[in-house]
Amino acid sequence: MILPINIYNDEVLRATAKPLKGIDRNIRDLVASMLESMRNASGIGLAAPQVGCSIRLLVIDLSCMEKYADEKPVVVINPHLLAVKGYNAMEEGCLSLPGILGDVVRPSSITLKYRDEHFEERTGEFSGMMARVLQHEIDHLDGKLFIDRMQKRDRRKIDKELHSLAIGNVEADYPLALAGIAQKACEA
């Protein structure tokens, strides 16, 4: 089921998400819906708060990018960053901020402890695009958006676009949720 994406100015995007204690059918259904919604919106990552669910769950699928065509989708539950290495800047966008792009400096390599789609504990080292997308999505679980990590002078350049989003003046090729509207997908 394709879920609407919550956009900038929705409280759920600024809240710290709660850890999951386990996986049940509702969570498995939510994961499937998140993957479907992300792909429908031509995204490569989606965190549960972006579909109105304040839980520590995210999905990533880089296979739409030629370089990562053989990669399988990744489900990450209750992530905890253990170590970071190196830094680089790269332009980022976000399904919750349609049409807005900005340069963000992030660690280029990370070590992450998390639970997978079977709730098995894992520790992995990630670099490049996967490290960047993981950090971007983990930020959503912590109530942060990529625009919070932009340099102030660059952030000021997009104030007009952010204001337009905040008042609901937005267009996207995928369903968007109105601020403050609870998602049925979260009723677990």
UniProtKB/Swiss-Prot annotation:
Pfam short name (any one) = Pep_deformylase
* Entry's EC annotation: 3.5.1.88
Q: What class of enzyme is it?
A: hydrolase
Reaction it catalyzes: N-terminal N-formyl-L-methionyl-[peptide] + H2O = N-terminal L-methionyl-[peptide] + formate
Active-site residues from the entry? 137
User: Which CDD domains does the UniProt entry name for this protein?
Assistant: Pep_deformylase (cd00487)
Q: Required co-factor?
A: Fe(2+)
Q: Per its UniProt record, what InterPro entries does this chain match?
A: Peptide_deformylase (IPR023635), Peptide_deformylase_sf (IPR036821)
Provide the alphabetized UniProt keywords: Hydrolase, Iron, Metal-binding, Protein biosynthesis
Q: Per its record, what are the GO molecular function terms? A: metal ion binding; peptide deformylase activity
Q: Which residues bind Fe cation?
A: 94, 136, 140
List this protein's GO terms for biological process: co-translational protein modification; translation
Q: Give the co-factor note.
A: Binds 1 Fe(2+) ion.
Which domain of life does the protein's organism represent? Bacteria
- What protein family does this chain belong to? Belongs to the polypeptide deformylase family.
What job does the chain carry out?
A: Removes the formyl group from the N-terminal Met of newly synthesized proteins. Requires at least a dipeptide for an efficient rate of reaction. N-terminal L-methionine is a prerequisite for activity but the enzyme has broad specificity at other positions.
Q: What is this protein called?
A: Peptide deformylase
Task: Name its species.
Answer: Chlorobium phaeobacteroides (strain DSM 266 / SMG 266 / 2430)
